[in-house]
Amino acid sequence: GYNIILVENPAEAAIRGLSKYITTIEDNKYNLALDFGQSFIKRSIISVDKSGINEVHTLEKIKSKYVTWEFNTKLEEEVEAKKEDQYIVDCITNTIQFCMENNYELGKEIVISIANYVENGKLKNRGGYGKLRLIADNYEEHLKEVLYKKLGTEYKITMVHDGTAMAAAFSEYPNSVCISLGTAFGVGFPIDK
């Protein structure tokens, strides 16, 4: 038989799953966990210890922009990719600034779920964030470099497909699948990291 589990606060599922991708736990520090969706960017500040996530501070969500994925020309796509990239960088830097102003001491890892297939920082040419592949072959490394230039701090950036991030929140259930009904229908499977 099947077990169907409905969760409270399903909008936090990807954020909770992202906590499992944090590789270095820094005592008394928080991590940024961002969920870049097709409609909104959900922003959270999370605290993680050896037993897992223990605090989630949800910030105001931001409207997603520049997530169109059909273009008439390559130039049109490149122009839109640059706008989307700048919007993402601004979102991250503004959120870091908010944390500094509100006494959240951040660790050196930022975890991001994204409504696009991604593997080791390489975004696939599919979906509203797929055009970011035109900005950099490895978008995680690109963000790391841009944030260092802007802020003088070196962050480790980890990007995960949003469905996979959600599923990670349920990784303790064997042979599981996570189904989401957001802007689009989504499916994710927990993976061994």
Segments and roles (model prediction):
Residues 17-25, 94-99:
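Phosphate/ATP-binding catalytic cores across multiple sugar-kinase/actin-like superfamilies
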Residues 14:
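Catalytic-loop motifs flanking and including active-site residues across diverse enzymes
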Residues 2-11, 67-89, 104-177:
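Glycine-rich phosphate-binding loop and adjoining helix at the ATP-binding site
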Residues 19-62, 175-193:
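Gly/Thr-rich phosphate-binding beta-strand-loop-beta motif of the actin/hexokinase/Hsp70
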Residues 32, 45, 89-106:
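Short amphipathic alpha-helices and their capping/turn segments at secondary-structure boundaries
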Residues 24, 34-35, 101-103, 147-151:
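Short, charge-rich binding segments
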Residues 38, 42-94:
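General N-terminal leader/first-domain-start detector
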